[in-house]
């Protein structure tokens, strides 16, 4: 189905283990067009939310555009803060014949970014993750909350 030039996969995870157990948000865009979303919060005994939806090629193309314009594929996480007790973030991307994987701590604000050893690279990561989360939340909300008239 997918050739080397149009191969696309993305996985994002952010989470921590605390007094409410393992709490996390994870989503992935798969090569077959499936978007998988999971959100686990045990706060007040919440249950895990899992959603799956198939996306059109136009939506996947927009996701690829967001990633390409961010230039995240040129970055390196060697000087980013490592995962700690606050939590961890992971971003894995395959676009064409390029593959990149990042692991860093949870980022609370731009102040954390500015204090890092690589503020430029981490800023790109921070804003890309923000854009991707907004994109995914919009897609999931549109797909599952629209009520027929």
From Swiss-Prot:
UniProt record, GO biological process: RNA splicing
Entries under InterPro entries matching the protein: Mago_nashi, Mago_nashi_sf
Localization: Nucleus
UniProt key word Nucleus: yes
GO CC list: exon-exon junction complex
Pfam family, one: Mago_nashi
PANTHER family linked to this entry: MAGO HOMOLOG, EXON JUNCTION COMPLEX SUBUNIT-RELATED, PROTEIN MAGO NASHI HOMOLOG
Recorded family membership: Belongs to the mago nashi family.
Protein name: Protein mago nashi homolog
Keywords linked to the UniProt accession: Nucleus
Superkingdom of origin: Eukaryota
SUPFAM superfamilies in the record: Mago nashi protein
């Amino acid at each position: 189905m997918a050739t080397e030039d149009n191969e696309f996969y993305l996985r994002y995870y952010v989470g921590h283990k605390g007094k409410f157990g393992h709490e996390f948000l994870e989503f992935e865009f798969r090569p077959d067009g499936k978007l998988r979303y999971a959100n686990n919060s045990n706060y007040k005994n919440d249950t895990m939310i899992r959603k799956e939806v198939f996306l059109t090629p136009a939506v996947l193309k927009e996701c690829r555009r967001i990633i390409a314009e961010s230039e995240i594929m040129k970055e390196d996480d060697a000087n980013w803060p490592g995962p700690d007790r606050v939590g961890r973030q992971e971003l894995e991307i395959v676009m064409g014949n390029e593959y990149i994987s990042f692991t860093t701590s949870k980022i609370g604000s731009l102040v954390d970014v500015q204090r890092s050893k690589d503020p430029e690279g981490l800023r790109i990561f921070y804003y890309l993750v923000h854009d991707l989360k907004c994109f995914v939340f919009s897609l999931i909300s549109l797909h599952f909350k629209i009520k027929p008239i």
